[in-house]
């Protein structure tokens, strides 16, 4: 559906830097900008094109008709969108921010008519941050949500060609595409991304409260359970606080299950129900990632109802693995 292959990345930390590398690997013409002198110097030192400031990068994007990708913390989105409106007001726009509904709302407030926006979010990362933590293969095999929100609000919905371009970028970066609405993404991410950061923080603090002996005994289960607690605190705050409503719902669910486990342990001396439920849930997760072939279908983006069909399939856990012209190959 699209042959465009030019990409402007705003933000060159872990995710933005990895997108720039992966897109370059796939043959895109790429450049970026960042407010971090450290990341700018590191990227330029590896031969990447780094514009002197965000405005310069966006003006080049406007001149070259490039896709613009925002890879900044949620707290910086409003300022960057103001720059987009000033320097590239009719661009094709996406983002990789960890929350989608609040970003869409910010787009409504700041962009001018003619901006064509499709939100996205790769579900990949590490506990480290910055350009040095990124790599071209960070997204290989990872799910990458590409929003399928519709409706008449042109400030937060682009045409199918832009959706295909963003999905094509995700596929070129090595990911598979999961179609979902912004609200569906935020509800799911609260449970499988944002809540784990809070639980890891609590687990790390509880372990530390046990004193030097407890930390000396910390091994695999403690290390695995607290890995993301090593992430930059301000980045975690931006992600979690930006998804407050959905995260509170997920946290209530977790607290309810922890309360049930405590009650069972206190009254019976056992925790069988909690452990069995968690074991089965983990096995189901592993099976969903195991590559079992449940068949595939094709969805032609030019047919009526195509985006709603993709949303329905994404809701069932299906993923787009290839894009041939206007046809999406969807694995069930």
Where are these regions (language model features)?
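Internal alpha-helical scaffold of NAD(P)-dependent oxidoreductase catalytic cores
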Residues: 138-230
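NAD(P)+-binding Rossmann beta1-loop-alpha1 motif at the extreme N-terminus of oxidoreductases
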Residues: 1-53, 59-62
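Phosphate-coordination loops involved in phosphoryl transfer and adenosine-cofactor binding
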Residues: 3-6, 90, 141
């Amino acid at each position: 559906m699209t042959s465009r292959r030019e990409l402007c990345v705003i933000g060159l930390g872990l995710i933005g830097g990895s997108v720039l590398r992966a897109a370059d690997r796939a043959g895109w013409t790429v450049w970026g900008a960042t407010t971090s002198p450290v990341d700018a110097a590191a990227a330029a030192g590896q031969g990447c094109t780094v514009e002197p400031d965000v405005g310069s990068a966006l003006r080049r994007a406007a001149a070259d008709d490039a896709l613009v990708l925002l890879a900044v913390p949620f707290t910086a989105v409003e300022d960057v969108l103001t720059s987009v409106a000033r320097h590239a007001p009719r661009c094709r726009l996406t983002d990789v921010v960890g929350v989608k509904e609040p970003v869409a709302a910010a787009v409504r407030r700041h962009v001018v008519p003619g901006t064509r926006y499709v939100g996205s979010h790769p579900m990949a990362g590490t506990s480290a941050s910055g350009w040095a933590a990124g790599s071209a293969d960070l997204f290989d095999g990872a799910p990458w949500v590409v929003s399928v929100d519709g409706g008449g609000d042109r400030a937060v919905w682009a045409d199918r060609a832009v959706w295909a371009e963003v999905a094509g970028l995700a596929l070129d970066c090595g990911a598979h595409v999961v179609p979902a609405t912004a609200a569906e993404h935020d509800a799911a991410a609260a449970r499988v991304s944002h809540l784990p950061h809070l639980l890891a923080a609590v687990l790390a603090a509880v372990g530390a409260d046990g004193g030097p002996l407890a930390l000396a005994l910390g091994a695999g289960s403690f290390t695995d359970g607290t890995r993301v607690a090593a992430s930059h605190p301000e980045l975690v705050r931006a992600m979690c606080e930006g998804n407050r409503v959905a995260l509170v719902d997920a946290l209530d669910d977790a607290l309810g299950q922890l309360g049930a486990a405590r009650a069972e342990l206190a009254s019976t001396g056992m925790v069988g129900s909690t452990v069995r439920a968690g074991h089965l849930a983990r096995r189901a997760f592993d099976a969903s990632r195991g590559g079992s072939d449940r068949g595939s279908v094709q969805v032609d983006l030019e047919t009526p109802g195509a985006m709603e069909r993709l949303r329905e399939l994404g809701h069932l856990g299906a993923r787009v693995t290839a894009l041939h012209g206007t046809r999406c190959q969807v694995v069930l």
